[in-house]
Amino acid sequence: MRELLISVKAQGHINDLLLSEPKLVKKIFSLIADIQKHPFGGIGKPEALKHDFAGSWSRRITDEHRLVYDVTDEKIMIIRCKDHYDDK
């Protein structure tokens, strides 16, 4: 099984959502569990990203929020889990 890492940014997003939308945090953890089993398929409509985010993947949390992550042979890095990846 790949090592799971969560970036400081994603940890901050989870903390923010715990206060504003706690039900989303449960969905985020469900997505993360599924990513560990099926990094490139599964729930949340996995999508390989392009352009500035090439090499990363996203899954839908809601219409507004996306979970963005990287996958290697050794690890899964959760990059962000709030807002849409086009929001810079």
Region spans (language model):
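Residue-level signal for threonine
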Residues: 7
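Generic detector of intrinsically disordered, low-complexity, polar/charged segments
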Residues: 38-41, 52
